[in-house]
Amino acid sequence: SQQIRLLERECGARVLDRTPTGAVLTAAGKVLADAAERIEDELTTVRRELADLDDSIPSGVVRVGSFASAVRALLLPLLSSLATTSPELEVIVEEAEERNALPRLRRGELDLVLMERDEHTLPAAPRGMADIPLLDESWLVVVPAEQAAPSTLADLARATWIDLAPGTAGAFALDRLERQLGVPLTTRHVAYDYDVVLAMVSQGLGCALLPELAVYSGLVPDELSVVRLPGLGVRQLVVRHRSTRTEPGPATRAVLEALLSQAQGIELG
């Protein structure tokens, strides 16, 4: 076409190879196509930054990565609230494991990531990031209904436990409980999803240590009992965001403020 010929004259190279079945990009054409994509990405970023300068009414898309119990207890009510109070904001929730979500936050694919920690063991945020504590919630013991409910921490030493996947807050909490009791705990079965853990307990496969939101944000099966004991510690929920000269932008700040308000309104214990 005329536009292609003009482009080839301006860059001094052939960008398309014509074949009987069509046309394909030459090496020079691929370089130009890649450059065009990068320029379009830069323009998108510039448009976003220019829009962020007008923060009188925050608007735009905010992508939030989170684990399941926080999605149910925090983010779903937040979406409902923002739809009424801030319709200019579009919050997109993605259920994601922390190990997958954090690299995406750094790449700009997510704007906020919710994280969980046993007690207050979160190290300082890496450069270019910032962490905001949302809430602390108690760890609870979940016991099969036919089993006698524990009344002290010492009773837990004789229980059979369902372990949580390595690296999760639940796994760290169970390890901490083992150190507190001073005896090795008997574990059987391992799960990552708290709903799976609840199902295992309801089948009589063992006891589990779960945080309040994981227990009460869904339906608690009748086949189990929930016990609160002093000394079990807390799970801390934290939200991480990029922290640079231009971030977080007005839309992300607005969602952060709404998320903090939502967390403060949750009644625990």
Show where each model-derived region lies.
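Hydrophobic hinge/microswitch elements
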Residues: S66, E97-L102, R106-L110, E116, ...
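Alpha-helical linker/hinge and terminal dimerization helices associated
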Residues: E10-C11, L32-D54
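Flexible hinge/capping segments at coil-to-helix
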Residues: P126-P166
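Beta-alpha-beta core module
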Residues: P123-P133, E137, D195-R245
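Central regulatory/effector-binding core of bacterial HTH transcription factors
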Residues: S59-L122
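A late-sequence structural motif
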Residues: L74, A148-A149, S225-G269
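A short LG(V/I)-centered, amphipathic sequence patch enriched
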Residues: R5-L25
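Secondary-structure junction motif
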Residues: E116, S151-L153, A157-L181, P248-E257, ...
